[in-house]
């Protein structure tokens, strides 16, 4: 690997390491909630699972929208525009609050929709009990994701990791205390699990905000000044970039929801095997998710500074390293499927043998699945670093719903492949996305490179403007930062 590429890899890994750890901490929180639901019995597990899936689908879209904040902060950081970066974070908090309110109202009143989809009334009752507590996690979750994007985009992801791990540990301790009624605490059941998650989720952004406020390294980023005056232009910019990102997250999540429904049609054993295999895939997938965020921020910094050649190099390094990591996980899925399934299920129990055997066969397909999924996710992040989310949405929509879903249904039912057919269909859609998004990144950078000289000149002008410049400033690839924002 050439020296410039090695520099980019080190920079991406410095960001990706803490972000991967933060993602795994979130997985640990979800796993803890699931285990605690299981302690309450199968009925509570079914109801809690229904509520958790509903919450995850809605919150995933919201997270996608506020993910745009990190993109914009990285671009302005590359342009040495601290005031613009702070303005993006402040506006992101307003967008996150609005999304939390809208999503909360939707989840609070979800009961009629769940009944329309044929869910058992008693299961819906339990799910709503869980959701009525969990809904209050949304404001904190959105605020944390905004602040996480802000601090990571300026190359300070360490506190995100520390607070995420602390949150996961607090979630475990409090959940266990409420479930077991320790220290005189009441046993609150599903409502208690949702309440604990909401409490932890709202404490995490407060801790991160306090850290940002007290650390001298953030002195030039004034997040409080002007927080009460949302900037319409910046809010619109976040939504222009964020809505397609949220849409991409939603259509991908929808594809996996369809896969789960297909497994339910095939049979209970197929559904159980699918859930076990998807958990293994989900844990491994946190690596490319962290790499994707890191690649987005690194490219955004180069893009903001007008360094298009370096942006392309960072994208290629990120995509290549993501594929390599997933190839290693693929090797584990090929060579050690029984051991991996054993982490989730007692394979020796007679009642589990059929499910375990089916899950092992799905992991063999998951090896290809992971390689494609990891590559497409990092490529998606690379394109977003160039402030383009529309391309990722269109490619994702086409590959997930015009290739992945039809192919899964065709192979599972028409071809008679059953559960394996569903997973090969998903792998086909993800392979299409991996190829399409990688080519889209190359096409995008090839179009931008002729403008590199002009971009560099613009970046120099941006720096020359300085903090005291009374006029609006323009960073490459950005809308102008209003003079009021610069004054903040």
Curated annotation (Swiss-Prot):
> Which GO molecular-function terms appear in the entry?
antiporter activity; transmembrane transporter activity; xenobiotic transmembrane transporter activity
> What's a single GO BP term from this record?
monoatomic ion transport
Keyword annotations for this protein, in alphabetical order, are:
Antiport, Cell inner membrane, Cell membrane, Ion transport, Membrane, Transmembrane, Transmembrane helix, Transport
Q: Which Pfam families match?
A: MatE
Is this entry keyworded NADP?
no
The family database entries (InterPro entries) matched by this protein are listed as:
MATE_fam, MATE_MdtK, MdtK-like
| Topology relative to the membrane | Multi-pass membrane protein
Q: Which residues form a coiled coil?
A: none
**What domain of life does the UniProt record list for this protein's source?**
Bacteria
Matching CDD domains, A to Z?
Answer: MATE_NorM_like
What are the subcellular locations of this protein?
Cell inner membrane
GO CC annotations on file: membrane; periplasmic side of plasma membrane; plasma membrane
Mind telling me which residue stretches traverse the membrane in this protein? Answer: 11-31, 55-75, 97-117, 127-147, 159-179, 190-210, 247-267, 271-291, 317-337, 355-375, 393-413, 421-441
What is stated as this protein's family in its record?
Belongs to the multi antimicrobial extrusion (MATE) (TC 2.A.66.1) family.
The protein's job, in short, is: Multidrug efflux pump.
Q: Which NCBIfam families match?
A: matE, PRK00187.1
Protein name, entry field: Probable multidrug resistance protein NorM
Taxonomy of the source species: Bacteria, Pseudomonadati, Pseudomonadota, Gammaproteobacteria, Pseudomonadales
